[in-house]
Amino acid sequence: MEGPPLSPAPADNVTLNVSCGRPATLFDWADHRLISLLALAFLNLMVVAGNLLVVMAVFVHSKLRTVTNLFIVSLACADLLVGMLVLPFSATLEVLDVWLYGDVWCSVWLAVDVWMCTSSILNLCAISLDRYLAVSQPISYPSLMSTRRAKQLIAAVWVLSFVICFPPLVGWNDRPGTLIGSRGSSACRLTCELTNERGYVIYSALGSFFLPSTVMLFFYGRIYRTAVSTTRAIAQGFRTTKEDEEGRLTLRIHRGRSVTQRAEQAAAGGARAHGQVRLTLSEPGARRQNKPSFVVHCREDSRAKNQYEIYTVVEGDSRPGRRVPQPQRPAKKLSSASQSSEDDSRPPRFISRVSRRNVRHQARRFRMETKAAKTVGIIVGLFILCWLPFFVCYLVRGFCADCVPPLLFSVFFWLGYCNSAVNPCVYALCSRDFRFAFSSILCKCVCRRGAMERRFRRTLLVGNRSQTEEDCEVAD
Protein backbone atom coordinates (compact mmCIF):
# COMPACT_ATOMS: atom_id res chain seq x y z
CA MET A 1 0.00 0.00 0.00
CA GLU A 2 1.56 3.25 -1.10
CA GLY A 3 1.65 6.34 1.04
CA PRO A 4 -1.52 8.39 0.45
CA PRO A 5 -1.13 11.89 -0.98
CA LEU A 6 -1.62 14.92 1.20
CA SER A 7 -4.41 17.25 0.17
CA PRO A 8 -4.28 21.05 0.37
CA ALA A 9 -4.82 22.09 3.97
CA PRO A 10 -5.82 25.25 5.75
CA ALA A 11 -3.31 27.05 7.93
CA ASP A 12 -4.55 25.65 11.23
CA ASN A 13 -4.85 21.94 10.43
CA VAL A 14 -3.74 19.16 8.12
CA THR A 15 -6.04 16.71 6.34
CA LEU A 16 -5.35 13.40 4.68
CA ASN A 17 -7.50 11.79 2.02
CA VAL A 18 -7.47 8.00 2.40
CA SER A 19 -10.49 7.30 0.13
CA CYS A 20 -12.83 7.22 3.11
CA GLY A 21 -16.31 8.71 3.16
CA ARG A 22 -14.76 12.17 3.59
CA PRO A 23 -11.32 13.52 4.39
CA ALA A 24 -10.34 12.89 8.01
CA THR A 25 -8.95 15.75 10.08
CA LEU A 26 -5.71 14.54 11.60
CA PHE A 27 -4.51 17.29 13.89
CA ASP A 28 -4.20 20.99 14.34
CA TRP A 29 -0.98 22.88 14.95
CA ALA A 30 -1.41 23.20 18.71
CA ASP A 31 1.44 24.40 20.89
CA HIS A 32 2.00 21.02 22.52
CA ARG A 33 2.46 19.38 19.11
CA LEU A 34 5.04 21.94 18.08
CA ILE A 35 6.89 21.49 21.37
CA SER A 36 6.82 17.72 20.92
CA LEU A 37 8.13 18.04 17.38
CA LEU A 38 11.04 20.26 18.47
CA ALA A 39 11.91 18.01 21.41
CA LEU A 40 11.90 14.83 19.31
CA ALA A 41 13.92 16.53 16.57
CA PHE A 42 16.51 17.60 19.15
CA LEU A 43 16.66 14.05 20.54
CA ASN A 44 17.15 12.67 17.04
CA LEU A 45 19.98 15.14 16.41
CA MET A 46 21.66 14.20 19.70
CA VAL A 47 21.50 10.49 18.89
CA VAL A 48 22.99 10.89 15.42
CA ALA A 49 25.67 13.45 16.33
CA GLY A 50 26.76 11.76 19.57
CA ASN A 51 27.15 8.26 18.20
CA LEU A 52 28.77 9.50 15.00
CA LEU A 53 31.29 11.28 17.21
CA VAL A 54 32.02 8.02 19.06
CA VAL A 55 32.68 6.14 15.82
CA MET A 56 34.90 8.93 14.50
CA ALA A 57 36.85 9.13 17.77
CA VAL A 58 37.75 5.43 17.72
CA PHE A 59 38.77 5.43 14.07
CA VAL A 60 40.74 8.70 14.22
CA HIS A 61 42.63 8.25 17.51
CA SER A 62 44.88 5.22 17.67
CA LYS A 63 44.86 5.14 21.47
CA LEU A 64 41.17 4.24 21.39
CA ARG A 65 41.62 1.29 19.03
CA THR A 66 41.30 -1.41 21.67
CA VAL A 67 39.35 -4.65 21.73
CA THR A 68 36.81 -3.23 24.17
CA ASN A 69 36.23 -0.21 21.96
CA LEU A 70 35.36 -2.52 19.06
CA PHE A 71 32.25 -3.42 21.05
CA ILE A 72 31.73 0.27 21.85
CA VAL A 73 31.80 1.07 18.12
CA SER A 74 29.33 -1.72 17.41
CA LEU A 75 27.01 -0.34 20.08
CA ALA A 76 27.40 3.18 18.68
CA CYS A 77 26.60 1.92 15.17
CA ALA A 78 23.38 0.34 16.45
CA ASP A 79 22.38 3.60 18.15
CA LEU A 80 23.39 5.58 15.07
CA LEU A 81 21.13 3.45 12.87
CA VAL A 82 18.33 3.99 15.38
CA GLY A 83 18.77 7.73 14.91
CA MET A 84 18.89 7.50 11.12
CA LEU A 85 16.35 4.79 10.26
CA VAL A 86 13.95 4.66 13.21
CA LEU A 87 13.59 7.94 15.07
CA PRO A 88 12.54 10.20 12.15
CA PHE A 89 9.57 7.96 11.35
CA SER A 90 8.76 7.45 15.04
CA ALA A 91 8.68 11.21 15.55
CA THR A 92 6.42 11.68 12.53
CA LEU A 93 4.01 9.04 13.80
CA GLU A 94 4.08 10.49 17.32
CA VAL A 95 3.34 14.07 16.27
CA LEU A 96 0.99 13.48 13.33
CA ASP A 97 -0.66 10.41 14.88
CA VAL A 98 -0.79 8.87 11.41
CA TRP A 99 1.51 6.64 9.35
CA LEU A 100 2.44 8.28 6.05
CA TYR A 101 4.87 5.78 4.54
CA GLY A 102 2.86 2.76 3.46
CA ASP A 103 2.38 -0.79 4.68
CA VAL A 104 5.64 -2.26 3.37
CA TRP A 105 7.84 0.32 5.04
CA CYS A 106 5.80 -0.07 8.22
CA SER A 107 6.84 -3.73 8.44
CA VAL A 108 10.45 -2.93 7.61
CA TRP A 109 10.55 -0.03 10.07
CA LEU A 110 9.23 -2.16 12.93
CA ALA A 111 11.73 -4.92 12.13
CA VAL A 112 14.65 -2.46 12.01
CA ASP A 113 13.50 -0.95 15.30
CA VAL A 114 13.54 -4.33 17.04
CA TRP A 115 16.82 -5.29 15.33
CA MET A 116 18.73 -2.18 16.44
CA CYS A 117 17.41 -2.21 20.00
CA THR A 118 18.19 -5.91 20.36
CA SER A 119 21.68 -5.49 18.95
CA SER A 120 22.30 -2.70 21.47
CA ILE A 121 21.60 -4.89 24.47
CA LEU A 122 23.44 -7.89 23.01
CA ASN A 123 26.45 -5.65 22.39
CA LEU A 124 26.26 -4.70 26.05
CA CYS A 125 26.28 -8.41 26.91
CA ALA A 126 29.43 -8.84 24.84
CA ILE A 127 31.02 -5.84 26.57
CA SER A 128 30.22 -7.25 30.00
CA LEU A 129 31.85 -10.55 29.01
CA ASP A 130 34.91 -8.68 27.76
CA ARG A 131 35.22 -6.69 31.00
CA TYR A 132 34.80 -9.83 33.10
CA LEU A 133 37.67 -11.55 31.28
CA ALA A 134 39.85 -8.43 31.55
CA VAL A 135 39.33 -8.11 35.31
CA SER A 136 39.34 -11.78 36.29
CA GLN A 137 42.08 -13.03 33.94
CA PRO A 138 44.32 -10.06 33.08
CA ILE A 139 47.32 -12.20 32.10
CA SER A 140 45.52 -14.43 29.60
CA TYR A 141 43.01 -11.78 28.49
CA PRO A 142 44.86 -10.79 25.27
CA SER A 143 44.77 -14.39 24.05
CA LEU A 144 41.21 -15.04 25.23
CA MET A 145 39.75 -11.90 23.63
CA SER A 146 41.81 -11.20 20.53
CA THR A 147 40.74 -8.77 17.83
CA ARG A 148 39.62 -11.63 15.61
CA ARG A 149 37.48 -13.20 18.33
CA ALA A 150 35.98 -9.83 19.18
CA LYS A 151 34.94 -9.31 15.56
CA GLN A 152 33.45 -12.81 15.44
CA LEU A 153 31.49 -12.11 18.63
CA ILE A 154 30.21 -8.82 17.21
CA ALA A 155 29.08 -10.57 14.02
CA ALA A 156 27.26 -13.18 16.12
CA VAL A 157 25.53 -10.38 18.06
CA TRP A 158 24.14 -8.80 14.89
CA VAL A 159 23.05 -12.13 13.40
CA LEU A 160 21.27 -13.17 16.61
CA SER A 161 19.56 -9.78 16.78
CA PHE A 162 18.27 -10.23 13.25
CA VAL A 163 16.94 -13.69 14.14
CA ILE A 164 14.82 -12.08 16.85
CA CYS A 165 13.41 -9.34 14.59
CA PHE A 166 12.84 -11.50 11.49
CA PRO A 167 9.69 -13.58 12.39
CA PRO A 168 7.15 -10.73 11.98
CA LEU A 169 8.41 -10.20 8.44
CA VAL A 170 7.34 -13.73 7.50
CA GLY A 171 3.93 -13.64 9.14
CA TRP A 172 4.36 -14.12 12.91
CA ASN A 173 2.19 -11.16 13.89
CA ASP A 174 -1.41 -10.13 14.29
CA ARG A 175 -1.14 -6.79 12.50
CA PRO A 176 -3.83 -6.63 9.77
CA GLY A 177 -2.26 -3.60 8.10
CA THR A 178 -1.88 0.10 8.51
CA LEU A 179 -5.56 0.97 7.99
CA ILE A 180 -7.75 1.31 11.08
CA GLY A 181 -11.48 1.47 10.38
CA SER A 182 -13.35 0.80 7.14
CA ARG A 183 -12.94 2.82 3.99
CA GLY A 184 -16.65 3.61 4.05
CA SER A 185 -16.24 5.36 7.38
CA SER A 186 -15.13 8.92 7.92
CA ALA A 187 -13.00 7.94 10.93
CA CYS A 188 -10.53 5.62 9.24
CA ARG A 189 -6.82 6.44 9.56
CA LEU A 190 -3.41 4.90 9.00
CA THR A 191 -1.20 3.61 11.80
CA CYS A 192 1.86 1.42 12.36
CA GLU A 193 2.15 -0.38 15.69
CA LEU A 194 4.02 -3.27 17.25
CA THR A 195 2.30 -6.61 17.12
CA ASN A 196 0.37 -7.85 20.14
CA GLU A 197 0.60 -11.52 19.16
CA ARG A 198 1.24 -13.19 22.50
CA GLY A 199 3.77 -15.76 21.33
CA TYR A 200 5.97 -13.24 19.58
CA VAL A 201 5.67 -10.74 22.43
CA ILE A 202 7.06 -13.33 24.86
CA TYR A 203 9.71 -14.45 22.37
CA SER A 204 10.95 -10.94 21.57
CA ALA A 205 10.77 -9.62 25.13
CA LEU A 206 12.82 -12.52 26.48
CA GLY A 207 15.32 -12.50 23.62
CA SER A 208 15.68 -8.74 23.33
CA PHE A 209 15.77 -7.72 26.97
CA PHE A 210 15.12 -10.04 29.90
CA LEU A 211 17.57 -12.87 29.12
CA PRO A 212 20.41 -10.53 28.02
CA SER A 213 19.85 -8.38 31.10
CA THR A 214 20.16 -11.46 33.31
CA VAL A 215 23.43 -12.38 31.60
CA MET A 216 24.80 -8.86 32.07
CA LEU A 217 23.86 -8.77 35.75
CA PHE A 218 25.53 -12.17 36.24
CA PHE A 219 28.80 -10.98 34.69
CA TYR A 220 28.82 -7.76 36.64
CA GLY A 221 28.17 -9.65 39.84
CA ARG A 222 31.26 -11.74 39.09
CA ILE A 223 33.22 -8.61 38.21
CA TYR A 224 32.31 -7.09 41.56
CA ARG A 225 33.41 -10.20 43.46
CA THR A 226 36.69 -10.35 41.53
CA ALA A 227 37.37 -6.66 42.12
CA VAL A 228 36.75 -6.99 45.86
CA SER A 229 38.99 -10.05 46.24
CA THR A 230 41.80 -8.55 44.14
CA THR A 231 41.69 -5.25 46.02
CA ARG A 232 41.88 -7.14 49.31
CA ALA A 233 44.82 -9.18 48.02
CA ILE A 234 46.72 -6.06 46.99
CA ALA A 235 46.10 -4.49 50.39
CA GLN A 236 47.14 -7.60 52.35
CA GLY A 237 50.15 -8.41 50.20
CA PHE A 238 49.35 -11.94 49.15
CA ARG A 239 47.41 -13.65 46.43
CA THR A 240 46.13 -17.21 46.08
CA THR A 241 47.51 -18.45 42.80
CA LYS A 242 46.35 -22.07 42.73
CA GLU A 243 43.56 -23.94 44.40
CA ASP A 244 42.52 -27.56 44.08
CA GLU A 245 41.32 -30.46 46.21
CA GLU A 246 44.73 -30.96 47.82
CA GLY A 247 45.18 -27.38 48.88
CA ARG A 248 45.95 -23.95 47.64
CA LEU A 249 49.19 -22.20 46.87
CA THR A 250 49.58 -18.69 48.27
CA LEU A 251 52.20 -16.26 47.07
CA ARG A 252 53.27 -13.66 49.61
CA ILE A 253 55.14 -10.63 48.37
CA HIS A 254 57.38 -8.62 50.71
CA ARG A 255 58.70 -5.55 48.97
CA GLY A 256 61.22 -3.45 50.89
CA ARG A 257 61.71 0.28 50.60
CA SER A 258 65.31 -0.07 49.57
CA VAL A 259 64.33 -2.02 46.46
CA THR A 260 62.27 0.84 45.08
CA GLN A 261 64.87 3.43 45.95
CA ARG A 262 67.63 1.49 44.28
CA ALA A 263 65.55 0.88 41.19
CA GLU A 264 64.68 4.58 40.91
CA GLN A 265 68.31 5.62 41.40
CA ALA A 266 69.47 3.16 38.77
CA ALA A 267 66.81 4.30 36.32
CA ALA A 268 67.86 7.92 36.80
CA GLY A 269 71.61 7.31 36.62
CA GLY A 270 71.70 4.62 33.96
CA ALA A 271 73.63 2.25 36.24
CA ARG A 272 72.81 -1.26 37.26
CA ALA A 273 69.80 -1.64 39.53
CA HIS A 274 69.95 -4.09 42.40
CA GLY A 275 66.74 -5.27 43.97
CA GLN A 276 65.62 -7.84 46.45
CA VAL A 277 62.19 -9.45 46.70
CA ARG A 278 61.27 -12.00 49.34
CA LEU A 279 58.74 -14.63 48.28
CA THR A 280 57.05 -17.09 50.61
CA LEU A 281 55.09 -20.10 49.42
CA SER A 282 52.62 -21.49 51.94
CA GLU A 283 50.04 -24.24 51.99
CA PRO A 284 47.15 -24.62 54.46
CA GLY A 285 47.84 -27.07 57.23
CA ALA A 286 51.61 -26.81 56.89
CA ARG A 287 53.63 -25.86 59.95
CA ARG A 288 55.10 -22.38 60.01
CA GLN A 289 58.71 -23.51 60.21
CA ASN A 290 58.30 -25.62 57.08
CA LYS A 291 57.20 -22.77 54.79
CA PRO A 292 59.42 -22.61 51.73
CA SER A 293 60.98 -19.17 51.69
CA PHE A 294 63.58 -17.68 49.43
CA VAL A 295 65.02 -14.36 48.36
CA VAL A 296 65.39 -13.25 44.77
CA HIS A 297 68.09 -10.70 43.93
CA CYS A 298 67.48 -8.91 40.64
CA ARG A 299 70.13 -6.83 38.91
CA GLU A 300 69.04 -4.94 35.81
CA ASP A 301 71.54 -4.31 33.06
CA SER A 302 70.97 -0.86 31.58
CA ARG A 303 72.86 -1.82 28.44
CA ALA A 304 70.39 -4.57 27.61
CA LYS A 305 66.80 -3.43 27.79
CA ASN A 306 64.37 -5.69 29.63
CA GLN A 307 67.21 -7.96 30.81
CA TYR A 308 67.68 -9.24 34.36
CA GLU A 309 70.59 -10.99 36.01
CA ILE A 310 68.95 -13.23 38.60
CA TYR A 311 70.49 -14.71 41.75
CA THR A 312 68.52 -16.77 44.23
CA VAL A 313 69.54 -16.93 47.88
CA VAL A 314 68.02 -20.04 49.40
CA GLU A 315 67.11 -19.75 53.05
CA GLY A 316 67.44 -22.85 55.16
CA ASP A 317 70.14 -24.28 52.93
CA SER A 318 73.06 -26.00 54.60
CA ARG A 319 75.29 -23.46 52.89
CA PRO A 320 73.90 -20.07 53.94
CA GLY A 321 74.23 -17.25 51.52
CA ARG A 322 74.73 -19.52 48.57
CA ARG A 323 74.00 -17.88 45.23
CA VAL A 324 72.60 -19.78 42.33
CA PRO A 325 73.29 -17.70 39.21
CA GLN A 326 70.75 -17.71 36.45
CA PRO A 327 71.41 -16.58 32.88
CA GLN A 328 70.12 -13.23 31.69
CA ARG A 329 66.74 -13.45 29.99
CA PRO A 330 63.91 -11.15 28.96
CA ALA A 331 61.57 -10.30 31.79
CA LYS A 332 58.45 -12.42 31.81
CA LYS A 333 55.61 -13.14 34.17
CA LEU A 334 56.30 -14.95 37.43
CA SER A 335 55.71 -18.66 37.12
CA SER A 336 55.74 -21.49 39.58
CA ALA A 337 59.19 -22.25 40.95
CA SER A 338 60.99 -25.43 40.06
CA GLN A 339 61.32 -27.86 42.92
CA SER A 340 63.59 -30.86 42.47
CA SER A 341 64.12 -31.65 46.14
CA GLU A 342 62.90 -34.92 47.55
CA ASP A 343 61.66 -33.21 50.73
CA ASP A 344 58.53 -31.11 50.15
CA SER A 345 59.55 -28.79 52.97
CA ARG A 346 62.76 -27.75 51.19
CA PRO A 347 62.58 -24.39 49.40
CA PRO A 348 62.85 -24.12 45.61
CA ARG A 349 66.35 -23.74 44.22
CA PHE A 350 65.61 -21.13 41.59
CA ILE A 351 62.85 -19.27 39.82
CA SER A 352 62.41 -19.98 36.15
CA ARG A 353 60.97 -16.57 35.28
CA VAL A 354 60.77 -13.32 37.22
CA SER A 355 58.49 -10.44 36.29
CA ARG A 356 59.98 -7.05 35.69
CA ARG A 357 56.70 -5.35 36.50
CA ASN A 358 56.29 -4.88 40.21
CA VAL A 359 53.17 -4.99 42.33
CA ARG A 360 52.55 -1.28 41.87
CA HIS A 361 52.26 -1.66 38.11
CA GLN A 362 49.90 -4.63 38.47
CA ALA A 363 47.74 -2.66 40.89
CA ARG A 364 47.64 0.29 38.50
CA ARG A 365 46.62 -1.95 35.62
CA PHE A 366 43.94 -3.55 37.75
CA ARG A 367 42.58 -0.11 38.66
CA MET A 368 42.43 0.82 34.97
CA GLU A 369 40.50 -2.34 34.11
CA THR A 370 38.17 -1.79 37.07
CA LYS A 371 37.54 1.81 36.02
CA ALA A 372 36.66 0.65 32.50
CA ALA A 373 34.32 -1.94 34.01
CA LYS A 374 32.67 0.78 36.11
CA THR A 375 32.11 2.92 33.01
CA VAL A 376 30.50 0.04 31.16
CA GLY A 377 28.52 -0.79 34.31
CA ILE A 378 27.05 2.72 34.25
CA ILE A 379 26.09 2.23 30.61
CA VAL A 380 24.43 -1.11 31.41
CA GLY A 381 22.57 0.39 34.36
CA LEU A 382 21.25 3.27 32.28
CA PHE A 383 20.22 0.87 29.53
CA ILE A 384 18.17 -1.24 31.94
CA LEU A 385 16.71 1.88 33.56
CA CYS A 386 15.60 3.25 30.18
CA TRP A 387 14.25 0.05 28.63
CA LEU A 388 12.82 -1.90 31.58
CA PRO A 389 9.56 0.14 31.83
CA PHE A 390 8.88 -0.26 28.10
CA PHE A 391 9.46 -4.02 28.03
CA VAL A 392 7.29 -4.53 31.11
CA CYS A 393 4.45 -2.62 29.42
CA TYR A 394 5.11 -4.43 26.14
CA LEU A 395 4.85 -7.80 27.88
CA VAL A 396 1.71 -6.81 29.80
CA ARG A 397 0.05 -5.52 26.64
CA GLY A 398 0.52 -8.92 25.01
CA PHE A 399 -1.83 -10.41 27.63
CA CYS A 400 -4.08 -7.39 28.22
CA ALA A 401 -4.17 -4.89 25.37
CA ASP A 402 -6.26 -2.33 27.27
CA CYS A 403 -4.32 -2.49 30.55
CA VAL A 404 -1.60 -0.03 29.46
CA PRO A 405 -2.73 3.55 28.67
CA PRO A 406 -1.50 4.74 25.25
CA LEU A 407 0.12 7.84 26.75
CA LEU A 408 2.08 5.79 29.30
CA PHE A 409 3.20 3.36 26.61
CA SER A 410 4.33 6.26 24.41
CA VAL A 411 6.33 7.84 27.27
CA PHE A 412 8.13 4.58 28.05
CA PHE A 413 8.66 4.00 24.33
CA TRP A 414 10.56 7.28 23.98
CA LEU A 415 12.39 6.76 27.26
CA GLY A 416 13.97 3.72 25.66
CA TYR A 417 15.00 5.78 22.65
CA CYS A 418 16.64 8.32 24.97
CA ASN A 419 19.19 5.65 25.89
CA SER A 420 20.70 5.95 22.41
CA ALA A 421 21.64 9.56 23.21
CA VAL A 422 22.93 8.82 26.73
CA ASN A 423 25.89 6.55 25.93
CA PRO A 424 28.11 9.20 24.24
CA CYS A 425 27.54 11.47 27.24
CA VAL A 426 28.70 8.69 29.57
CA TYR A 427 31.87 8.20 27.52
CA ALA A 428 32.60 11.93 27.66
CA LEU A 429 32.08 12.10 31.43
CA CYS A 430 33.82 8.88 32.48
CA SER A 431 36.61 8.37 29.95
CA ARG A 432 39.45 10.88 29.65
CA ASP A 433 40.55 9.40 26.33
CA PHE A 434 37.10 9.75 24.78
CA ARG A 435 36.77 13.25 26.20
CA PHE A 436 40.07 14.28 24.63
CA ALA A 437 39.11 12.68 21.30
CA PHE A 438 35.72 14.41 21.27
CA SER A 439 37.23 17.81 22.02
CA SER A 440 39.95 17.43 19.38
CA ILE A 441 37.45 16.41 16.69
CA LEU A 442 35.10 19.26 17.54
CA CYS A 443 37.96 21.75 17.66
CA LYS A 444 39.17 20.62 14.25
CA CYS A 445 35.70 21.02 12.81
CA VAL A 446 35.29 24.48 14.33
CA CYS A 447 38.76 25.60 13.27
CA ARG A 448 38.23 24.28 9.75
CA ARG A 449 34.92 26.07 9.54
CA GLY A 450 36.55 29.27 10.78
CA ALA A 451 39.33 28.94 8.20
CA MET A 452 36.77 28.43 5.42
CA GLU A 453 34.85 31.51 6.55
CA ARG A 454 38.03 33.59 6.65
CA ARG A 455 38.99 32.34 3.17
CA PHE A 456 35.50 33.18 1.89
CA ARG A 457 35.65 36.66 3.37
CA ARG A 458 39.10 37.21 1.89
CA THR A 459 37.79 36.14 -1.52
CA LEU A 460 34.87 38.55 -1.23
CA LEU A 461 37.19 41.34 -0.16
CA VAL A 462 39.55 40.76 -3.10
CA GLY A 463 36.59 40.60 -5.48
CA ASN A 464 35.16 43.87 -4.16
CA ARG A 465 38.52 45.59 -4.54
CA SER A 466 38.85 44.38 -8.13
CA GLN A 467 35.33 45.57 -8.95
CA THR A 468 36.06 48.95 -7.40
CA GLU A 469 39.24 49.33 -9.46
CA GLU A 470 37.35 48.44 -12.66
CA ASP A 471 34.66 50.99 -11.87
CA CYS A 472 37.29 53.64 -11.31
CA GLU A 473 38.97 52.85 -14.62
CA VAL A 474 35.63 53.10 -16.44
CA ALA A 475 34.94 56.44 -14.80
CA ASP A 476 38.30 57.79 -15.87
UniProtKB/Swiss-Prot annotation:
Q: How does it sit in the membrane?
A: Multi-pass membrane protein
Quote one Gene Ontology molecular function term. adrenergic receptor activity
Cell membrane among the record's keywords? yes
Gene3D superfamilies associated with the record: Rhodopsin 7-helix transmembrane proteins
Query: Chief location of this protein?
Result: membrane
Residues on the Cytoplasmic side? 61-69, 128-152, 222-375, 431-476
- Biased composition of type Low complexity is found at 266-278
Glycosylated residues in this chain: 13, 17
Which keywords appear in this protein's UniProt record, sorted alphabetically? Cell membrane, Disulfide bond, G-protein coupled receptor, Glycoprotein, Membrane, Receptor, Transducer, Transmembrane, Transmembrane helix
- Tell where it localizes: Cell membrane
Q: Which domain of life is it from?
A: Eukaryota
Among CDD domains, the record links this protein to: 7tmA_Octopamine_R (cd15063)
Q: Where are its TM segments located?
A: 37-60, 70-93, 104-127, 153-172, 201-221, 376-396, 407-430
Disulfide bonds, paired cysteine numbers: 106-192
Locate the region Disordered: 266-293, 317-351
- GO CC annotations? plasma membrane
Q: Which family does it belong to?
A: Belongs to the G-protein coupled receptor 1 family.
Q: Which PANTHER family match?
A: ADRENERGIC RECEPTOR-RELATED G-PROTEIN COUPLED RECEPTOR, TYRAMINE_OCTOPAMINE RECEPTOR
Summary of the function given for this chain in its UniProt record: Orphan G-protein coupled receptor.
- Please state what the protein is called: Probable G-protein coupled receptor No9
Source organism (scientific name): Amphibalanus amphitrite (Striped barnacle)
